[in-house]
Amino acid sequence: MAKLHDYYKDEVVKKLMTEFSYNSVMQVPRVEKITLNMGVGEAIADKKLLDNAAADLAAISGQKPFITKARKSVAGFKIRQGYPIGCKVTLRGERMWEFFERLISIAVPRIRDFRGLSAKSFDGRGNYSMGVREQIIFPEIDYDKVDRVRGMDITITTTAKSDDEGRALLAAFNFPFRK
């Protein structure tokens, strides 16, 4: 089992129970899932770019990505409905905790000119979204084999009812928020 999951059960639950004075352990917010999304708009011209992006996402997450398709046609972007334009992965359970641990301890500190993550990126319901400009911050990606530096969106979905609860949950994991 992931160390971060054990830490959550042993330390974080107790800390949040006292901080928000919950009546039950089940009221304590928890991380439900982590979604990684990589939009590859250039895949319209070259299908190989989407395959490379999917391979990168599979290496980072340890799970085969789902190819996302365009919902509607947009003439300005030269896309038609049903065109493959990206890939995404939803992590739950053990893989989610392992990825979350790697994200906090290894990947985020490797971001160039890193001064902390914005605490304003909550959606109003306790879920946190962040963007990564380079996939090479993850140790699974070999810098020499990268065909193109591409970013991704990372969404951490929690069971928190408010942004304050979600912020407290992530801060308990030593999430590097900007001061």
Swiss-Prot record:
Q: List the disulfide bonds.
A: none
Q: Which domain of life is it from?
A: Bacteria
tRNA-binding as UniProt keyword? yes
Keywords from UniProt, A to Z, are:
Ribonucleoprotein, Ribosomal protein, RNA-binding, rRNA-binding, tRNA-binding
Does Disulfide bond count among this protein's keywords? no
Q: Name one GO molecular function term.
A: tRNA binding
Q: Which GO terms describe its cellular component?
A: ribonucleoprotein complex; ribosome
Instruction: Output the GO biological process annotations, alphabetical, semicolon-separated.
Output: translation
Which InterPro entries does the record associate with it? Ribosomal_uL5, Ribosomal_uL5_bac-type, Ribosomal_uL5_C, Ribosomal_uL5_dom_sf, Ribosomal_uL5_N
> According to its UniProt record, what is one Pfam family this protein matches?
Ribosomal_L5_C
Name the HAMAP family for this protein: Ribosomal_uL5_B
Family assignment from sequence similarity: Belongs to the universal ribosomal protein uL5 family.
- What is this protein's function? This is one of the proteins that bind and probably mediate the attachment of the 5S RNA into the large ribosomal subunit, where it forms part of the central protuberance. In the 70S ribosome it contacts protein S13 of the 30S subunit (bridge B1b), connecting the 2 subunits; this bridge is implicated in subunit movement. Contacts the P site tRNA; the 5S rRNA and some of its associated proteins might help stabilize positioning of ribosome-bound tRNAs.
Kindly state the subunit structure of this protein.
Part of the 50S ribosomal subunit; part of the 5S rRNA/L5/L18/L25 subcomplex. Contacts the 5S rRNA and the P site tRNA. Forms a bridge to the 30S subunit in the 70S ribosome.
- Name of this protein: Large ribosomal subunit protein uL5
Task: State the species of origin.
Answer: Erwinia tasmaniensis (strain DSM 17950 / CFBP 7177 / CIP 109463 / NCPPB 4357 / Et1/99)
The UniProt gene name for this protein comes to: rplE
